[in-house]
Design a protein with these regions (language model features):
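Hydrophobic cores of alpha-helical transmembrane segments in multi-pass inner/ER membrane proteins
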Residues: 66-79, 129-141
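Alpha-helical transmembrane segments of multi-pass membrane proteins
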Residues: 30-47, 169-174
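N-terminal membrane topogenic signal
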Residues: 14-27
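Juxtamembrane "helix-exit" motif on the non-cytosolic side of transmembrane helices
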Residues: 43-45, 108-117, 143, 172-175
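Final/C-terminal transmembrane alpha-helix of multipass membrane proteins
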Residues: 155-175
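Short aromatic-rich membrane-water interface segments that cap or initiate transmembrane helices
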Residues: 53-66, 190-203
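Non-cytosolic membrane-interface motifs at loop->transmembrane helix junctions
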Residues: 51-58, 116-128, 184-186
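Small-polar-interrupted transmembrane alpha-helices in polytopic inner-membrane proteins
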Residues: 35, 39, 75, 79, ...
Length: 203
């Protein structure tokens, strides 16, 4: 590329950085609102298992990670067409920030419940909001990280998100019998019996 082409490429990238910062705030708000609504989607659908594959089917910590994952991934798709095409680390930055956000929910939840001995709804909401904010903040940081400026990093990022979504779908119907997947309300795992109606059987 010529010097002029490099110059314009740099200008476009810098403008995209600014757009990323502004869009991330919108993404944060979208994720908090959409995540809050998704909490009720499975019950509102009457226990539709297709809906349950992408929304919480019980009150376990694992299932509630969908409240961050699904809106964040959906908004990332929008961001890609708004400004992401111009950023060489877009997919790597997005996937890494989402993974850290999910880990933050788990760590913050078990840390505070370990200290106080139980969970509180207000604190759970706070954990979700803080983790969502962390996700979008880190996205703005990572998108400027030269270490992620490679096709390999982006491919790994896309693969990681795809794998984790597949894992969430699989564990919706076949959850491991461990604390992360246990519904503290029913002391059970997976889809509650009152909702369990397989799409394959129905169809």
């Amino acid at each position: 590329p010529t010097g002029e082409q490099v110059k314009w490429r740099i200008i476009i990238i810098m403008q995209s950085f600014k757009t990323a910062a502004k869009t991330s705030f919108v993404g944060f708000l979208f994720t908090v609102v959409a995540g809050s609504l998704l909490h009720f989607a499975f019950a509102a659908s009457g226990g539709n298992t297709l809906v349950g594959a992408f929304t919480p089917v019980n009150e376990s910590v694992w299932e509630h990670l969908k409240l961050l994952l699904i809106p964040a991934v959906a908004f990332s798709a929008v961001e890609f067409f708004v400004y992401g095409k111009s950023l060489p680390a877009f997919f790597a930055a997005k996937s890494l920030s989402v993974m850290i956000g999910l880990a933050a929910i788990v760590m913050l939840f078990y840390t505070y419940t370990g200290i106080v001995g139980r969970n509180y709804l207000a604190a759970d909401i706070g954990v979700f909001i803080v983790s969502a904010a962390l996700t979008y903040y880190l996205s703005c940081v990572f998108v400027k990280c030269p270490a992620l400026y490679s096709e390999r990093a982006n491919i790994i990022g896309i693969s990681l998100v795809a794998d984790i979504i597949i894992l969430f779908i699989y564990f919706t119907f076949t959850p491991p019998m461990c604390g992360l997947f246990r519904d503290p309300v029913t002391d059970d795992f997976g889809i509650p019996d009152r909702f369990y109606s397989s799409i394959l059987i129905d169809k």
